[in-house]
């Protein structure tokens, strides 16, 4: 399946999911190119509506492989141009119609404490995976902010699909 969304923003409004099987070998870009061909007529119908949701002058549309069961995490970063560090993360997965309803702050320390307290093996495994990913995302956000010379506060956004995370955008 393919998700179409306005590059210029829109806060999730106007996004469309198109059914297009993506079972091709090769890079993600090649997969998207091959998957879009069968649905080209349908694309024309939805592009104008998706473009209309974009803010500013950028009316371009992004097509990406849709991840069905997804969580949305944000990491706050701060830098002065010479260094960059993280200020913690927020789970923004509670959404309705692609709009955040609730943001829950979570720290590495809180996850570690929850792992120690739980007696449920399945819950423990999930928490351990979450802790590992949160640490990785914080390290990546700090490295990325430092690499671009971040001289302010920013948000490093990721999506999580089971045990993998993917950089989405930095605001």
Annotate each predicted stretch with a short phrase.
Residues 38-92, 136, 155, 159-166:
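Phosphate-binding site of ATP-dependent enzymes
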Residues 2-3, 19-68, 99-130, 138-149:
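Conserved ATP-binding module of the ATP-grasp superfamily
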Residues 16-21, 78-80, 87, 104-106, ...:
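Short beta-strand-to-turn element immediately C-terminal to the catalytic PLP-Schiff-base lysine
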Residues 152:
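Bilobed periplasmic-binding protein-like "clamshell/Venus-flytrap" ligand-binding domains
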Residues 9, 13, 95-101, 166-171:
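Short acidic (Asp/Glu) and glycine-rich catalytic loops that position anionic groups and cofactors
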Residues 1-15:
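A conserved helix-loop-beta module that forms one wall/lid of the active-site cleft
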């Amino acid at each position: 399946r393919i998700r179409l969304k306005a590059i210029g923003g829109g806060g999730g409004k106007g996004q469309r999911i198109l059914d297009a099987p993506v079972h091709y070998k090769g890079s993600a870009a090649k997969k998207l190119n091959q998957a879009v061909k069968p649905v080209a007529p349908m694309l024309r119908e939805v592009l104008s509506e998706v473009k209309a949701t974009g803010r500013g002058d950028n009316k371009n549309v992004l097509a990406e492989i849709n991840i069905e069961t997804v969580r949305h995490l944000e990491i706050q970063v701060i830098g002065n141009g010479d260094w960059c560090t993280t200020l913690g993360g927020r789970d923004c997965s509670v959404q309705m119609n692609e709009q955040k309803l609730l943001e829950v702050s979570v720290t590495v320390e809180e996850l570690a404490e929850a792992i120690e307290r739980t007696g449920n093996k399945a819950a423990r495994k999930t928490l351990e995976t979450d802790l590992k990913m949160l640490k990785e995302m914080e390290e990546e956000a700090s490295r990325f902010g430092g690499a671009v010379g971040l001289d302010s506060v920013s948000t490093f956004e990721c999506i999580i699909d089971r045990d993998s995370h993917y950089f989405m955008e930095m605001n």
